[in-house]
Amino acid sequence: AHNKMSKRHGDPSYEDLVAQGFLTEAIVNYVALLGWAPGGEREIFSINELAEAFDMSRISKSPAIFDIEKLTYFNSEYIKAMSPEAFARAAEPWIRKAVKTESCDPALIAAILQQRTEKLSDIPEKLGFFDTLPEYDTALYVHKKSKCDETVALDMLKKMRPRLAAITEWTEEAVHDCLIGAATEFGCKNALVMWPVRIAVSGEAVTPGGAVEICHILGRAETLARIDKGIEKLEK
């Protein structure tokens, strides 16, 4: 919306924007720039930097125009710049709206979301597969770039299941080494191992994070159960 700001026109309040998943710092930064020009090209400031740079002589007299797309851009930049710990704290309530499974660590989920999130409210819709594997079509296993089709995917899942089951300590590094090591041993590209495993454990064409991160977060038992389901679907 590129309209002059007015409550009469239903412009969002601060509380509305927070409820829509915008960070306080991004809102303050954006609103400060609506009626004030800091000079220079820079737009993204911390609250402390804004306080230092603010100059009454640079306030504009013309009515401000509220642009939700610009605020969204500010918000995504703030999210990317946050420490992983700060983002995990901010994201956890939104993660838990979608992921009720206690064993899925919200901090690990936050780590795969941080660079891909514009607003905190975007988070829940990306995570439904963690609690429940969705019904999916086996056509998802077809990926031309990595030369994967349903036959190759079935073969790969059957080879990878015992390898994943044999991991002694289920860490992200161990899962990574298992999958990459298999690709090296099979003499194929990493994607030919990663793609079918990721589809089997997520049931989604697009996911935050790849096969390694998702398997690690789901845990051994759930990963193996989902691979079994993938094998069963592909054998039909």
Q: How would you describe each model-predicted region?
A:
Residues 1-79, 92-93, 195-206, 229-230:
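Alpha-helical recognition segments enriched in aromatics with Gly/Pro capping
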Residues 1, 51-59, 98, 117, ...:
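Short, mixed-charge aromatic SLiMs
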Residues 19, 76-80, 118, 165-168, ...:
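Amphipathic alpha-helical interaction elements
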Residues 84-186:
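Small-residue-rich helix-loop
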Residues 173-235:
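Charged substrate- and nucleic-acid-binding regions of tRNA-handling and nucleotidyl-transfer enzymes
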